[in-house]
């Protein structure tokens, strides 16, 4: 049997052991905290993750850690991978097999660079450079400094930092009042990433809560107290392209064949209109760009400009046909020849814009048509010429609908024009409306939501016509429908118009012998409903197909609705 005193001794010793363990834990925790604090806060102790690499500082941000491949140096040249160029500069960059060169576009530039010779082709002109594209470890690299004119860059190389500044972005510089430590964070206890001396020039990026984020001459980015900087100077402002049209676009196509002269519109003033698109140009059966301007076309341009209308002529491919169009689209050389010819006519006739109206193309050529638009766009921007591209409704025929990549076209071109008509067209096997409101809205939403085209880049094209359908007692078509201009719609005496709420238009039918005539009416009422979509979805405006098919009240109706949408 244990003595009571022995039990007491054991009980007294247990708390002392626990106290010692607790003290040790506290001491270890304090030491760990001190070590972590020193490692994270002590000046210049921590090295950047990218300290041993070539760092890329793009528009005041070190993006090295986000690159797919390292920046490399070969023979004194700095190279950036094509994958990273695609990420930061040109999502559409690609290797053109026909010429074995990389083709890239950016803003007002289209360029190609090869793998063997030190030359760069920029907007059609070739110049000598000091490097070419290379392939290393199955990765394609481009000499980024040599590409500065393509991507509008100011390039600086300091030690292991490659500094790229977009010339279209605002830049503010300032002077250091005294010797300073540049901090990783806006905190005196943060680690130092660089040191600057009194009088050093820095790029002032942004100011917040008494601290200014800066970039040093070495390319390092960090924070200093705002009071330690002086003599702020804006060396460059943000550059934004001015829109040619203020407010909503109110446009029409002015069609005429190559066998007649351009319309004489002398003395005409069309209410609210600010853009005209005469069908001046076409691709012939040999794939050549032809113009039918002549003296009458020159007078047309003078008339339009005298009224303040911008001239965006259409280029059509209907005469070329699907095969010739395919031949052009599938050849880089032929695309560039066509683009050079378009540039020439834009300069010669002082055009304000170009409307690409290519229809009936192979679905297989969808990406090639997109390439044509991608390559045409910078050349038009270089001239200050607006690029608009016509597309049909999604989810239709392979050669009339599925041949367009509306997402790419909408991203690249200034305007995507949705030809919101021919819901039931010449090839339809049953009668129907030319452009029912519900169909127009449904397809418009597809373009905005599914194809992700910004609404303010979409011009809604309206039909100034309908079709006259004739069916037998079985409801079968007895002949191809005829096009009837809005101006020439005739409703026989005694025939009542029937309103269709979904279509937002009137419908008529009447007997013609043993057959029945059916017509869905396009008039001021139906046009008003469709134009209201501009306001509802924030669209860029409207265009009418085509001039001289409309009734006299249409321009007042369109102008009124567009004015509402502009407010």
Place the predicted regions along the sequence by residue.
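Primary recognition of N-terminal secretory signal peptides and signal-anchoring hydrophobic helices
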Residues: 2-209, 235-242
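SH3/SH3-like beta-barrel fold
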Residues: 199, 211-216, 224
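Glycan-recognition patch characteristic of GH18 chitinases/ENGases
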Residues: 232-341
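Short, acidic/polar
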Residues: 255-271, 330-348, 398-407, 522-535
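Conserved, mostly hydrophobic/aromatic
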Residues: 276, 356, 416, 460, ...
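Substrate-binding surface in catalytic domains of secreted glycosidases
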Residues: 286-295, 340, 363-492
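Glycan-binding loop/region signatures in secreted carbohydrate-active enzymes
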Residues: 464-530, 559-567
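Acidic/aromatic/glycine-rich contiguous surface patches that form carbohydrate-binding/processing clefts
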Residues: 530-567
